[in-house]
């Protein structure tokens, strides 16, 4: 515990290095500032803002809903040991780290971030297909592949949507753009994680009690129900983000000379 506290202190001190300097000429009390409502109205009048936020919310929810049920699924349905289920988290994190590297490579080449985000959603569809079919095939390896691809697809989607937000013509409202991204991302993620657990519990209770029919009397039914919802949410994400790819035909100018994990606020 003391080691964690000391590490946190050191990391916070390091984070203060090169912190953005104050700009009194922009933050003085004498400068007239519009209300949040006026600022948001101006910001939302950009044609693709609301569609972007809807796509972000759907995609984030799709990748987050499985967060607290992935390991129990491996243990309860596939009979994995405690150590084997712990590895699932490592696989998901490894997939996300690999996605960050891939995103850095292609975004620095000015690839359309919306297109890359849609590719992340496609990987998510493949991931949940692997997870869903791992139960009838009794294949822990297929399940592990699904866990890895969830991290990879989610990583691509998160970084790409953040880069897209940073590339908005915000007219001096960069903080609002990133704040909107963070608010939608955090809200969608929190609601989805909670909903995933509740849906799994409710459906599992109904299924094991026989209220859903004899064919669905299985411990896997509740989990499968959640994974199918995520599957459909990813299709909805593709529908929402598709027009953004069309609207953004020209390559997006790279918004930063560097790309790293420090650019991902969550």
Task: Report residues per predicted region.
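A membrane-interface helix-boundary motif in multi-pass transporters
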Residues: 1-5, 201-233
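C-terminal membrane-cytosol helix-exit motif in multi-pass small-molecule transporters
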Residues: 5-25, 237-245
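Juxtamembrane intracellular "pre-TM" segments in multi-pass secondary transporters
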Residues: 20-53, 256-266
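Short amphipathic helix-loop junctions that connect adjacent transmembrane helices
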Residues: 68-85
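Loop-to-transmembrane helix entry/capping segments in MFS-fold secondary transporters
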Residues: 82-83, 169-184
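Helix-to-loop junctions at the C-terminal end of transmembrane segments
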Residues: 98-115
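C-terminal ends and interior cores of transmembrane alpha-helices
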Residues: 122-138
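Intracellular juxtamembrane helix-capping segments at the cytosolic ends
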Residues: 156-170
